[in-house]
């Protein structure tokens, strides 16, 4: 019986092939994480020339800071809205395009367009449309007696950044959902239709369970996206306002580290955010993946 394990002529070749990825991981992930952990235990001057070990004082100060607690819950709320809304909307459009016979190529291309737009550009686009004075959407809302001004209304500001973030990510989610739906054997759908199952029942009883692995993958990806990659959207759309209503943890880290020059507090917040993402990811793999059936 032959073994399928690859055999290399040189014992060093496998390590050589893995080395580039290991170097990138060390330089861009492990090293910065170690630096953040070290600075989080220090009291650092604004220019980083001198430091003094203070232990966990920076973390204690964080959790006694009401603004930090507010940004923590804002992050949880924002990430939940972006992740859940993004997945549901993308799945809806993927299922819709799946059942469109004529012109499906046009709709596929249309759904992929947001992916080509930079996050900051996406934010500026929706700022123009939601501009309180000249925006097309705000003019339409005013016709129905609804006053829109996201610069003064915290709820409207949160809606704007969530909406822009979901719109930016919808193409990525759509692509995976649509490919997953296309991979479902037609015989299963046709057999269910012969048995009298309608389109909605076929989707929830056959299609949705079969695309569960893709859904779980996108759940993890969208959670990371909501925590980190939405920074340009928030920065361009609201700058964390009004009154820090849209200041997420990642934006607060930037503001304290690069604007306030409080390197120690910024590092401590980075460590807390890192552990928060790790805990949420482990929980997803522990409790959500256990319900996913892989083929």
From Swiss-Prot:
It comes from Escherichia coli O157:H7. Part of the ABC transporter complex UgpBAEC involved in sn-glycerol-3-phosphate (G3P) import. Probably responsible for the translocation of the substrate across the membrane. InterPro entries: MetI-like, MetI-like_sf, UgpAE/MalFG_permease. Residues 33-80, 131-156, 229-262 are periplasmic. It is found in: Cell inner membrane. Residues 1-11, 102-109, 178-207, 284-295 are cytoplasmic. One of its GO terms (cellular component) is plasma membrane. PROSITE patterns: ABC_TM1. This is sn-glycerol-3-phosphate transport system permease protein UgpA. The complex is composed of two ATP-binding proteins (UgpC), two transmembrane proteins (UgpA and UgpE) and a solute-binding protein (UgpB). Its main location: membrane. It is a multi-pass membrane protein. CDD domains: TM_PBP2.
């Amino acid at each position: 019986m032959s073994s399928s394990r690859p055999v290399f002529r040189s014992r060093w070749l496998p390590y050589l092939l893995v080395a580039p990825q290991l170097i990138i991981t060390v330089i861009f992930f492990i090293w910065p994480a170690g630096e953040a952990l070290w600075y989080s235990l220090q009291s650092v001057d604004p220019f980083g020339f001198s430091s003094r070990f203070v232990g966990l004082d920076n973390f204690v100060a964080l959790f006694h800071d009401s603004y930090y607690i507010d940004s923590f819950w804002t992050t949880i709320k924002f990430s939940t809205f972006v992740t859940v809304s993004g997945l549901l909307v993308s799945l809806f459009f993927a299922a819709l395009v799946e059942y469109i016979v004529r012109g499906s190529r046009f709709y596929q291309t249309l759904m992929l367009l947001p992916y080509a737009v930079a996050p900051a550009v996406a934010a500026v686009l929706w700022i123009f449309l939601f501009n309180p004075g000249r925006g097309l959407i705000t003019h339409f809302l005013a016709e129905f007696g609804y006053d829109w001004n996201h610069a003064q209304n915290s709820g409207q500001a949160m809606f704007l950044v969530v909406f822009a973030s979901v719109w930016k990510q919808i193409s990525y989610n759509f692509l995976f959902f649509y490919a997953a739906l296309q991979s479902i054997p037609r015989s299963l759908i046709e057999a269910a239709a012969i048995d009298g199952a309608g389109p909605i029942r076929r989707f929830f009883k056959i299609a949705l369970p079969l695309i569960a692995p893709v859904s779980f993958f996108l759940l993890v990806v969208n959670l990371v996206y909501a925590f980190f990659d939405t920074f340009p959207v928030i920065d361009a759309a609201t700058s964390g306002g009004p009154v820090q209503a849209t200041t997420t943890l990642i934006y607060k880290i930037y503001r304290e580290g690069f604007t306030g020059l409080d390197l120690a507090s910024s590092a401590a917040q980075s460590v807390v955010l890192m552990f928060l993402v790790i805990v949420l990811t482990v929980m997803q793999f522990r409790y959500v993946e256990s319900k996913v059936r892989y083929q």
